């Protein structure tokens, strides 16, 4: 495929920007639609080349289209990532200062949690801790709905975790801000919000990474220390269709207690 950008690339980029993040099957359909609409030769196996052309043109703007895997469903996603504004300031045009502060504190609750979730009650209680303008509980509830709609958070059964878009766009921020506590998957080396931890050495694995790594192994052992893996191996089909359950993301009891104590101390010192 030629390295020159054309109308099909431009339309593809506009659609991706308007969605913020798109699942792989939708991106493949968009690729075909853009090529056919602008009468550009379409090849179903050339999506990576198509995106590569865009990325070469986006590079001087410090932007790139990245591919990631959703922790909730194990599916592939594409998102446009700004390499300069790789922290929460990129949200400043959409949210007020106190709303951004609430989002930062919500992220911290999720990242420091044992299972990658924060309850709605714990987030509502943050309204009284804001250093900027205080918020009413009703305002926090409405703001959480906005974060979910804009694909910064995922809400389920009164609990919240980070959306794939948030993890992809703010990965560098998470690594830099929480470098001592942020979990990094031992298999894919990406930030792991929901994960399983080794009972012995404490290394984390994404659920889908654990499922792939241990697939077909009768006696799974930790990829780092070779000790027996203490968790139920995630069913990749179940993760993809339903998302992970809390039992899948929970660590062993002893590790959980140590992490909980560390998290409490960290929050107290902040």
UniProtKB/Swiss-Prot annotation:
Query: Can you state which reaction this protein catalyses?
Result: S-ubiquitinyl-[E2 ubiquitin-conjugating enzyme]-L-cysteine + [acceptor protein]-L-lysine = [E2 ubiquitin-conjugating enzyme]-L-cysteine + N(6)-ubiquitinyl-[acceptor protein]-L-lysine
Question: So what family is this one in?
Answer: Belongs to the NSE1 family.
Q: Which PANTHER family match?
A: NON-SMC ELEMENT 1-RELATED, NON-STRUCTURAL MAINTENANCE OF CHROMOSOMES ELEMENT 1 HOMOLOG
| One GO MF term attached to the UniProt entry | protein dimerization activity
User: Cross-referenced SUPFAM superfamilies, in alphabetical order?
Assistant: Cysteine-rich domain
Region span, Disordered: 236-270
Alphabetically list the UniProt keywords: Chromosome, DNA damage, DNA recombination, DNA repair, Metal-binding, Nucleus, Telomere, Transferase, Ubl conjugation pathway, Zinc, Zinc-finger
Q: Which GO terms describe its cellular component?
A: chromosome, telomeric region; nucleus; Smc5-Smc6 complex
Question: Subunit composition?
Answer: Component of the SMC5-SMC6 complex.
Superkingdom per UniProt? Eukaryota
**Which InterPro entries does the entry mention?**
C1-like_sf, Nse1, Nse1_RING_C4HC3-type, WH-like_DNA-bd_sf, Znf_RING/FYVE/PHD
One GO-annotated biological process of the protein: double-strand break repair via homologous recombination
What is this enzyme's EC?
A: 2.3.2.27
Q: What class of enzyme is it?
A: transferase
Q: Where in the cell is it found?
A: Nucleus; Chromosome, Telomere
Pfam families registered for this protein in UniProt: SMC_Nse1, zf-RING-like
**ZnF (RING-type) intervals:** 185-226
Q: Which Gene3D superfamilies does the UniProt entry name for this protein?
A: 3.90.1150.220, Winged helix-like DNA-binding domain superfamily/Winged helix DNA-binding domain, Zinc/RING finger domain, C3HC4 (zinc finger)
Name of this chain's protein: Non-structural maintenance of chromosomes element 1 homolog
- Primary location: nucleus
Give residue spans, biased composition: Polar residues.
237-251, 259-270
Q: What does this protein do?
A: RING-type zinc finger-containing E3 ubiquitin ligase that assembles with melanoma antigen protein (MAGE) to catalyze the direct transfer of ubiquitin from E2 ubiquitin-conjugating enzyme to a specific substrate. Within MAGE-RING ubiquitin ligase complex, MAGE stimulates and specifies ubiquitin ligase activity likely through recruitment and/or stabilization of the E2 ubiquitin-conjugating enzyme at the E3:substrate complex. Involved in maintenance of genome integrity, DNA damage response and DNA repair.
